[in-house]
């Protein structure tokens, strides 16, 4: 299976790898996993007073497609509102990275992680 240039780029030069302080009330953390393939993804967002995602970090244990999906998701989330971030779909990630059908689940994980991080943030703020 050949990976697209974008997958290779995000895999070899992942953006926003790291960790934010999960105890910070302005940070939401999403942790998701796919037991079928062993991929585990932690995605975190830091939201400013205006409700804009000012930072996003990830740590992914998994294949190149999972790492690339996480990296791209964090890039796309920065500068967006929570509502805008929640509109990011796995199909958009898969299309942007030209993921083969057998790797689509990696983009699903990224979408799930985005939603989980937003949900965690809203829960911390009493918005849910």
Curated annotation (Swiss-Prot):
<comment type="similarity">
    <text>Belongs to the NifU family.</text>
</comment>
<dbReference type="GO" id="GO:0051536">
    <property type="term" value="F:iron-sulfur cluster binding"/>
</dbReference>
<dbReference type="InterPro" id="IPR011339">
    <property type="entry name" value="ISCU"/>
</dbReference>
<dbReference type="Pfam" id="PF01592">
    <property type="entry name" value="NifU_N"/>
</dbReference>
<dbReference type="GO" id="GO:0005737">
    <property type="term" value="C:cytoplasm"/>
</dbReference>
<dbReference type="InterPro" id="IPR002871">
    <property type="entry name" value="NIF_FeS_clus_asmbl_NifU_N"/>
</dbReference>
<comment type="subunit">
    <text>Homodimer. Forms a heterotetramer with IscS; each subunit of the IscS dimer contacts an IscU monomer.</text>
</comment>
<protein>
    <recommendedName>
        <fullName>Iron-sulfur cluster assembly scaffold protein IscU</fullName>
    </recommendedName>
</protein>
<dbReference type="GO" id="GO:0016226">
    <property type="term" value="P:iron-sulfur cluster assembly"/>
</dbReference>
<comment type="function">
    <text>A scaffold on which IscS assembles Fe-S clusters. Cluster assembly on IscU homodimers proceeds sequentially from 1 2Fe-2S per dimer, to 2 2Fe-2S per dimer and finally 1 4Fe-4S per dimer. Subsequently IscU transfers the Fe-S cluster to other acceptor proteins. It is likely that Fe-S cluster coordination is flexible as the role of this complex is to build and then hand off Fe-S clusters. The clusters are very sensitive to O(2).</text>
</comment>
<dbReference type="GO" id="GO:0005506">
    <property type="term" value="F:iron ion binding"/>
</dbReference>
């Amino acid at each position: 299976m050949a990976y697209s240039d974008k997958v290779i780029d995000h895999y070899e030069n992942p953006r926003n790898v790291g960790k934010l302080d999960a105890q910070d009330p302005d940070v939401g953390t999403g942790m998701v996993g796919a037991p079928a393939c062993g991929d585990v993804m932690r995605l975190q967002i830091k939201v400013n007073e205006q409700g804009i995602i000012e930072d996003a970090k990830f740590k992914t244990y998994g294949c190149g497609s999972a790492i690339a999906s996480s990296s791209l998701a964090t890039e796309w989330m920065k500068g967006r509102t929570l509502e805008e971030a929640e509109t990011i779909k796995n199909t958009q990630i898969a299309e942007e990275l030209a993921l083969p059908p057998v790797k689509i689940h990696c983009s699903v994980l990224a979408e799930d992680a985005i939603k989980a991080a937003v949900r965690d943030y809203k829960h911390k703020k009493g918005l849910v």
